[in-house]
Amino acid sequence: MGLLDSLKSTFTSSGEASVPPAASFATREGVIYAPVNGVLVNLSEVPDEAIASGMLGQGYGIEPITGTIYAPANGRIGATTVTNHSIGMITEDGLRVFIHVGLGTVEMNGKGFARFVEMGDTVKAGQPLISFDREAIKAAGHEDIVTVIISELDRLKSINHVGESGTLIGGNPLVKLGDPLLVAKTK
């Protein structure tokens, strides 16, 4: 068993179709936290041109080791999809965050996905938002990479990429749920 397999078994939980318990982590203004456990990937390395180019905003990709997306900050749900593969939120300090699970997963029509929140819901950092079946995504021929993007960059005074870890897998850092990823300040 390799290091990545060992980490997967460490982080994997059973019964992900039911609402998982909330995670608990401290929050600070302007900070977007890792919404899932996994291996951090530079956005420019995500195999999707619109995402990799930064056209949609700045952020990270995360190769997930678990199948639940948690709120990366306090805020409210600003967008949902009927296919449950992506979600948008507006943080308490006005940051617009878009989380997308997988590439091409819209074609799955919601199979393998469950959403635990609705449009307009107020959420706390660490609250479960979406669960997804990584094996179903791969069986459908898609990648399960999760992208976390801050959009509407013209509203920002600054954005700093802080996602890092001392543990490297294939040269990329491992991130745990609740690790800081991005620090942004609005104008």
Region spans (language model):
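Contiguous, well-folded functional domains in the mature portion of proteins
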Residues: 2-187
